[in-house]
Structures are given as C-alpha cells and as structure tokens.
Amino acid sequence: MKKLFLLLAMLVALCSGVAGNISGWEAVPFIGMPKAYAFETKPVNFVVIDRTGSVTKADMRGWIQMVKMDYHVPYYGLMDDNTKAIAAVNDMFAKNPKPDKEAMKAAAEQAGCGALVVMVVHRMESYMVHSYGPFDDEIYVRTFAYADMFAYNSDGNKFIRRFLRETDFEPAGQDENPSDTIKWTLGNLLNKMEGKPQI
C-alpha cells in the first residue's frame, strides 16, 4: 500500500510541475528510443490524357501503383488535385506536341510539383480473331497499346520519355491486356530514370 501511495505521489508531483522544470530534458532522447526526423515531402502529379475514352478506374489504379512505386512516402506525395498540373500540361502540349526536358521542367514548375509524370493514351484495345484455316481452329487476340509517356523529376533534373507503340497477336489466353502492357512499360520507364532495377 505504501508503494502504491508513493507511486501516486510521484505521478502527481511530475504532472503538477513540483518535481521541477524538465523542459531541458525534452531534446535529450532516452537510450534505445528512436529519434524522429522530419522529411520534406515533394508533391508529385500524375496526369493522364485519355484519347481513347476507354480508360477505367481499374486502369488508373494500376498506373498510379507504378508511379507510387518510385515516388512514395515519406519523400514524395501523390497529389489528389491535378487542376494546376492539367492546365500546365495543356499549355505544354499546345506549344510542343513532343515535349523535351525544358518543356517538362517548365510544366512542373508551373504546376508547383517536384516530379511530374504525364501519359497520353492513344490506343488501348483488344479483339478476338477466329482462324478459318482447314487445320487451324484457334482463336487469337490482337492487342494495341499506344501511349506517350513523359517524366520529369526536379531532384537531379532528370527527364525521360517513351512513345509506346505495341501491337500483338497471340492465341487466346496467352495475350496481355493492353492496360497491363502500358502499366509495366510505365513502371520500367520510371525505374530507368530513377536508376532502379527493371520489373
């Protein structure tokens, strides 16, 4: 009972300030306790221009996953509001349909972001083709994945671009979804720019 009373008395003394000023000890970490560090989180904008009208939310989720793989918390934060970035990208494409490093840098500065990833989807479709040969009754799938990809990172003044034009013709079941083709190409492109291994 005495130990409990003594413990309560110490807690009251510490909480009420009777034990003295401990503000000088706040900056001293306890042994074994981790120290918190503040990171500067750079904003990242990912702008997709859909020229096909067929980009779905599932497609966007897959592509955003690739962007987040290279530009992740705590160093980068993907912005939810793309209003300024879309305006900057539209201005950029009005001046130059195939932007270079300086155009992307200017667009990133106008958008107020540390990294800017832009993708223009021109064609993304697949359809089945039936074989009518006498000895071939296979069903094939023809796929089209056409997209222009641009990326700029102010950290290191890095820039990369790629004009993807992939057409494939495979037996049904062995074909790759055009959205996935674009997804993996985008991921590898960003990894290449950031010096990371290919997927």
Where are these regions (language model features)?
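Sec-dependent N-terminal signal peptides
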Residues: 4-13
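Extracytoplasmic/secreted cell-surface and envelope-processing proteins
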Residues: 126-132
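N-terminal segment of the mature soluble domain
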Residues: 39-122, 156-162, 189-196
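Hydrophobic alpha-helical membrane-insertion segments, chiefly the h-region
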Residues: 14-20
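Single-residue recognition of alpha-helix boundary sites
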Residues: 13-14, 131
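C-terminal/domain-edge helix-coil "capping" segments
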Residues: 20-44, 110-111, 123-126, 137-199
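Short, P/G- and charge-enriched loop/turn segments at secondary-structure junctions
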Residues: 105, 133-139
